Each structure stands twice: as structure tokens, then as C-alpha cells.
Amino acid sequence: MTNVLIVEDEQAIRRFLRTALEADGLRVYEAETLQRGLLEAATRKPDLIILDLGLPDGEDRK
């Protein structure tokens, strides 16, 4: 099964993406912050990461 990690701070967007991706048979994991996303990516090794480039805790990493 394909694993997808969504890193997005807006719950409504995460919910929309999760619903669409799970309907296609994908396993979905979520993170609200960049820090949590990095931890989830290292732990779960997703096949695809959908990343919000405007996360508040990611401003200093650009």
C-alpha cells in the first residue's frame, strides 16, 4: 500500500486531502507542523509527502 504524509497546518485542508487520498486506497498520515512532519517522515518513510511550504514553523528554513 502507498503511504502519504500530509504536512499542513489547516485542518480543513488536511481533512479534504485525507478523504480524497483514502478514497483512492492510499494510507494517509498527518502532521500539523514542520517539526512533526520531519518526525513522521523519519519514522514512517512515506512514499509521498504533501507539504505546505508556508508553515509557520518553517519560515527560518527557507
What does each model-identified segment do?
Residues 1:
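Phosphate-coordination loops involved in phosphoryl transfer and adenosine-cofactor binding
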Residues 5, 30-48:
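Acidic, metal-coordinating helix/loop segments flanking the phosphotransfer/catalytic sites
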Residues 8:
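Conserved acidic carboxylate
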Residues 11-29:
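Two-component/phosphorelay signaling modules centered on CheY-like receiver
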Residues 33, 59-62:
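Acidic catalytic/metal-coordinating carboxylates
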Residues 52:
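Active-site residues of response regulator receiver
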Residues 56:
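The feature encodes the CheY-like receiver
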